[in-house]
Amino acid sequence: MNQNNKHRTLLFRAALAAIAIAAAIFFWYQLKTPQQSSPSDQSSGLRHSPLPPVQVATAKEQAVPRFLAGLGTIQAANTATVTSRVEGQLIALHFQEGQQIKQGDLLAEIDPRPFQVQLAQAKGQLAKDEAILANARQDLNRYQKLANTHLISQQEMDNQRALVRQHEASLKVDQAAIDSAKLQLTYSRITAPISGKVGLKQIDVGNFISSGNSSSIVVITQTDPVDVLFSLPENDINAVLQAQKTNHDVVVSAWDRNNQQQLAAGKLLSIDNQIDATTGTIKLKARFSNQESILFPNQFVNVRIKVDTLENAVVIPNAALQMGNEGNFVWMLGKENKVSKHLVTVKLQDTKRVVISAGLAAGDKVVTDGIDRLTDGAKVDIVTPMVNKPQPQKHDQTENS
């Protein structure tokens, strides 16, 4: 029994010794084997650094155009409401709704027969009065012969001369009636007063149409070119006037409602002669070519008018500009990758870039991302933004959408 206990004790001690030796070998192997980074770290390329990571951009010197912005409305350069100048039955329409027409094109016809009858009557009256005048002149010639023999009085002679002049005047009245009848007959053929695009017809063939503005046939709008009417604050008028003096053709561009896509470019046409006392703005008009018919009357657009160009301007991304209690500032990257706060003066700013007039020079580096963790004099870790290539399937979906 004692021998069995001793044997078990020896086996237990031998097992413990083997475990201890195996553990020692394992830890020794771990210490000698270098650690490898995880696959995710290798694929992403991220660097684990105790320094705050930032992205930077370099201030650039470039020419920057200066624009004034406003909200405008497209207007047709000319609009004409086509009406009839004579009364009658409409017998024909010679246009299609939405058609582009030219000045002088035939649009509609009114029954011409009543006007042809009036013309014939006027011509008949002229022929009648011509015959009466011829007879009066013959009588006058006879009276003149008899006057030499004193067979008629001077009073009768004067009356005959007056009668001839009266009939001569009647011929002029008759000729005027003929001209009027011809004009009325011409008005029965209604032509386009301007070139442009016709709208929807306002009357159908077969209806009786009256003269004047009471019954219109169609409205024509001149859509090429078109005008844009917009307003600017009265404080901007001096910049516009100066731009007109420097460059007579002031460039104006029209943008879509989201202010993302330029629709057309044109030139400033005119400036109103007074400021609206209620709004403190002044109206301006620009003219645009519209050959592709992408601008429609009464369409709202964003307007940008170029007033000048800032040469050698210092430009930084809009993300670099910060606002503090002391004013506008940027985080500038200095030596040893240390950042410092610099106050700057802003000249111009839009959604993408900022023009700095003081506080920065071309070539200075400013922080654009990671700004919230910065302190003055802190050392930073500059990282490059990762650009993910779009997958083909997503790209196709974007194009289809």
From Swiss-Prot:
Pfam family, one: HlyD_D23
Primary localization: membrane
GO CC annotations on file: efflux pump complex; plasma membrane
One of the GO BP terms on file: response to toxic substance
The keyword DNA repair is annotated on this UniProt entry: no
InterPro entries: CusB_D23 (IPR032317), Multidrug-R_MdtA (IPR022824), RND_pump_MFP (IPR006143)
Cleaved signal peptide residues: 1-20
Entry coiled-coil feature ranges: none
Keywords per UniProt: Cell inner membrane, Cell membrane, Membrane, Signal, Transport
Location(s) in or outside the cell: Cell inner membrane
Membrane protein topology class: Peripheral membrane protein
One term of GO molecular function: efflux transmembrane transporter activity
Domain of life, source organism: Bacteria
SUPFAM superfamilies in the cross-refs: HlyD-like secretion proteins
Family from the record: Belongs to the membrane fusion protein (MFP) (TC 8.A.1) family.
Quaternary structure note: Part of a tripartite efflux system composed of MdtA, MdtB and MdtC.
PANTHER family: MULTIDRUG RESISTANCE PROTEIN MDTA
Name of the protein: Multidrug resistance protein MdtA
Native source organism of the sequence: Photorhabdus laumondii subsp. laumondii (strain DSM 15139 / CIP 105565 / TT01)
This protein's encoding gene: mdtA
